[in-house]
Amino acid sequence: MTTYKPYGMTELQSLLQQAAEQKLPVLTRHQHSAGLGIDFQNWNKIREIDTVNLTVTAERAVTFGELEEAVNEKGLHVAMMTEDLRAVNLGDFFAEQMYCLTSLHYNQPRLQILGLEVLLADGTVLQVAGKTVKNVTGYDMCRFYISNREQLAIPLAVTIKLVSLEAVQTMLEAYIADEAVLVKLAARLRQQNITPQVCLYWNKAAAELLQQAEPAGRLIMVCNGSKQRLEKDLQAISAIADELQIGLQLCEQPEQVWYEIKMLRTHTVWGDGVKVPSLRCDGMLRLLAKQQIACWYNPLQGSLQLIPAQADGVLYRQLCSEAEALGGVGNWYYMYQYGFAAAGETKIWQRLKQKFDAGQRLNPLTEGGAEHGAE
C-alpha cells in the first residue's frame, strides 16, 4: 500500500481522482490491504472555539489531548474525553467507533457532534449541520456520516458540543469476583439516579492480560462535579457498596488506571462486540469467564468490549447467539465481515454503498472477509 500525506483539499481530491482512475481502494486507516492510503496528519488545526455556543471545531488529526488543553483554557471540557484517549485523534476515534467511557453520563459521542465537514468518494466536500442544537426532521446526515466507519464518506473536521469544566473529580476502585454483584450494583445506582462520569469493569481474564495478579475483576468509578454534589454522590455510592459488601476505596494511582484502560483499548478485538441488557450481563460474564475471554464494559450499559485469544467467525457467532438468548444483540459490522449478518440489513448496506461510493473503494468491507480474523 502506498500512503500519501496531502497538504490541502486540491491535493486530496486529486488523490481520490487518481484512485478512481486506477480502480484502487482508498484506505484511511492502518489496514494491510493493497490500495491508496491517505494519512491525514496535516489536517491538524483547531479552527474555532466558540464560547457563546459552547462548541469547538477541529480537524480530524487533532488529538483529544490537544483539544482538551485548548478548551480547558476557556473553562470548558470535551465530554467524550478521558485520559486514556489523550493521544487518540478525532479521525481514528470515529472511524474505529471507539468505546466512549462517558457516554452514559454525557450522551453518546455521535450525539455530541453538531456539525461535520466530509469528503465523499467522488471528491465532493459537504458541510453538514452546524453549531446549534436542534431537532432533526427527516434523515440526520451528521450522525449518518459520523457512524459509518468511513465506508461512505471521510470526515475532515467536526464541530463538538462542549460542557463546563468540572472542578472536582474522584476515582474509586474495588475488586469483584461475583458477576451477580455487578448487576445488583447497576440496579441500585439506577434506583438512586446516580450516573458516575465513568463506570468500568474488566474481568479476571482482562486483568491477567494486563499482568495483574488479582483474584477477581476490577471495578473503576470516576465521579465529578461541584464539591457539594460530589460529596452527596460519594455518600450514596459508599452506602450502596456497604450494602452489597463491596470493598470500595479511593484509587491511589489513577494515572496507572488510565494507562491500563489504554492498554485494554489497544488489545480489544471486537469493540462493542455484543450488547446485553445491563441487568442480565452476569450470564454473559460467566460464559466469557468459562471460555477465558477477556472483556471490559460499563455495568450500567451492557456493551461489552471483547478480547479473545483467537478471533474467528465461529467464536463470534457463538457469542452473538448467547447474547441474543439474554435479550441482547451482536454487532452488525462484525457479523457482516464473518458472513452471517441479516439479509435485510446487508441489502440496506449494499444500497447505501452503491449510492455514496458506487466504485466500492472507500475502506471496502468484504462479507466473510479477513479483517479481525474473519474466516
Language model segments and positions:
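Conserved glycine-rich FAD pyrophosphate-binding loop
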Residues: M9, Q22-L24, D39-Q41, E68, ...
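A generic, well-ordered mixed alpha/beta core segment in the N-terminal half of proteins
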Residues: L54-L119, Q127
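Short beta-strand
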Residues: T28, C199-W202, C295-P299
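A glycine- and small-aliphatic-rich helix-loop capping segment at beta-alpha/alpha-beta transitions
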Residues: A34-K45, V71-L76, E96-Y106, T132-T137, ...
